[in-house]
Amino acid sequence: MGTPCQSARGPRTTPLPHCPPPCLPGAPDQQTRRLPPGWGQRTAPTQVGLADAASPDELQDQASGARPGGGNRVGAGRGRPGTPAPSRQSRRTGPAEQADHAHSNPTGGCSDPQRSPRTRQAGYALGEGSAGLGSRGPRPHPAFQVQWSARNPGCPRTWRRRSGAQRGHPPPGAGQRPSGPTGGRPAAPGAPGTPAAPGPGGGAAVPSGATPHPERGSGPADPPAAARLPPERQEPRLPQDLAAAQRCPAGPPPTRSGAAAQRTHRRPPGCPRSARNPGCPRTWRRRSGAQRGHPPPGAGQRPSGPTGGRPAAPGAPGTPAAPGPGGGAAVPSGATPHPERGSGPADPPAAARLPPERQEPRLPQDLAAAQRCPAGPPPTRSGAAAQRTHRRPPGCPRSARNPGCPRTWRRRSGAQRGHPPPGAGQRPSGPTGGRPAAPGAPGTPAAPGPGGGAAVPSGATPHPERGSGPADPPAAARLPPERQEPRLPQDLAAAQRCPAGPPPTRSGAAAQRTHRRPPGCPRSARNPGCPRTWRRRSGAQRGHPPPGAGQRPSGPTGGRPAAPGAPGTPAAPGPGGGAAVPSGATPHPERGSGPADPPAAARLPPERQEPRLPQDLAAAQRCPAGPPPTRSGAAAQRTHRRPPGCPRSARNPGCPRTWR
């Protein structure tokens, strides 16, 4: 046998320094039991050099003494981490015999006398035997290490749900997302080990014809196979989104800090993502809105790329531009552009050629529709405003199909905001429990046709909200809302032309979403400024309750409704109303108590009153149900629905649509 220490049956002499622990004398099974945990179970058996022989037949060779010095280096490949490490033979034999193999083997446990266990462990770092103790699969080529991203780690809807739900906490591990050999920075296309240039002949070790890395792709390569499917057939997934962002002819969007980074420059009309403005509100809204307050993790870095987030000359080498077949600027005319990323002088993708009504509503098409707006992309604004920008012209699919008449979007995303809109459960309250009442039933704002509301002289159109006022709607308001040009100024104009007069002034965002106008009124009918606009405006300020929100519902009863007619209540403000109001006297409209007349200013019809905060409050108090309960924060404004009889109710301070 070799040196004295290597035979368990030989005389006990001093062990040599280079022998591994199992060589120490003792009962064979004890030796096996004393192995450090993990040695000999997961990876190649300890008795054989890790890099040298790990497969059953090699073990057998060595055990029979056939091959003294070192295992077969080619065979070492067969013992790669993926293979079941302990050989079948050693599993069949018990621990004692296993130990025996090591000792009947000519060089004992050290198949290479020059290497101590420590050196052998260092072999891991050199990538020799296994990728590490307990490693489960072959270590992939560095260029493919990030494939998880392409495998659609979840349709944006999912991600959004996942991260949005966690509001305030970035999705776990978010910061690390842009990883990979180059730490998330682009590398020179084709540099060894980069995920770059994944076309045939692309990244260093990608054999020509290999599938390029689907997400990081760059260089004059074809789009990845998955991307060649028309958008309908692709699963909508976040990475592809991101990819699309990069391949916009205008280059990636400029970097902004904070949440602004995501909703940045609208892409040029030719670009799908551009048009779909920078990512169909549905997605982006969901993505950014959900995490409101925390930019999506790593947002600042997202728009990177060879040109550092600035647009490059289309077709410049290494730009993410024009990814049609043959890459570079010139998409040969007639070539089908990449259906989602499409760019260059190409037609819109086939799916996009259908009129919006005939397309299935799906994220990509959303995007497409956005892009087909005759008015071109909306102007860029900074901050949250960027996403909810110019109204589309009446001809425009996105305006028409309203897939984001932000009324919808706002509602949709706002609703998913993680918290149900405050007070949601209570909202539909009132005498009829939120159900429509028989037209003309006493106390309802219903039946606003001739002969409708209680005391409206027959033939006069009642003011649907206040229930009085023989005024006709302004001429402009007689057009159906579709035929009116949607435009901000007219919005405002309409607000003034409401038979009910302008809305009371409030400070902060509240000022904009105020009382609903009667159906006759353009702004009313359009509900007070088709929430598309108003939503846009006020929604933007979301996050800070309009100043003073908490104090709003005050008054003698501290914001709680009081028994109608109780002394000092704001209740029953009709003739004969509050307790001490002499019958026939008009109660004080704001405090609703005492024999006082309303202040002179309050006697003017609303149109003639200057809009001012107190009157607002007054309106709140004059609700038969009393002022809304006080809530803190923004909740204060969108509170309980007033009963139909109440002016502020009717304009329901907050018809969720408005207030929301």
Swiss-Prot record:
<protein>
    <recommendedName>
        <fullName>Uncharacterized protein BHLF1</fullName>
    </recommendedName>
</protein>
<keyword id="KW-0677">Repeat</keyword>
<feature type="repeat" description="4">
    <location>
        <begin position="524"/>
        <end position="648"/>
    </location>
</feature>
<feature type="compositionally biased region" description="Polar residues">
    <location>
        <begin position="104"/>
        <end position="116"/>
    </location>
</feature>
<feature type="repeat" description="1">
    <location>
        <begin position="149"/>
        <end position="273"/>
    </location>
</feature>
<feature type="repeat" description="2">
    <location>
        <begin position="274"/>
        <end position="398"/>
    </location>
</feature>
<feature type="region of interest" description="Disordered">
    <location>
        <begin position="1"/>
        <end position="660"/>
    </location>
</feature>
<feature type="compositionally biased region" description="Gly residues">
    <location>
        <begin position="67"/>
        <end position="80"/>
    </location>
</feature>
<feature type="region of interest" description="4 X 125 AA tandem repeats">
    <location>
        <begin position="149"/>
        <end position="648"/>
    </location>
</feature>
<feature type="repeat" description="3">
    <location>
        <begin position="399"/>
        <end position="523"/>
    </location>
</feature>
<feature type="compositionally biased region" description="Low complexity">
    <location>
        <begin position="427"/>
        <end position="446"/>
    </location>
</feature>
<feature type="compositionally biased region" description="Low complexity">
    <location>
        <begin position="552"/>
        <end position="571"/>
    </location>
</feature>
<feature type="compositionally biased region" description="Low complexity">
    <location>
        <begin position="177"/>
        <end position="196"/>
    </location>
</feature>
<keyword id="KW-0244">Early protein</keyword>
<feature type="compositionally biased region" description="Low complexity">
    <location>
        <begin position="302"/>
        <end position="321"/>
    </location>
</feature>
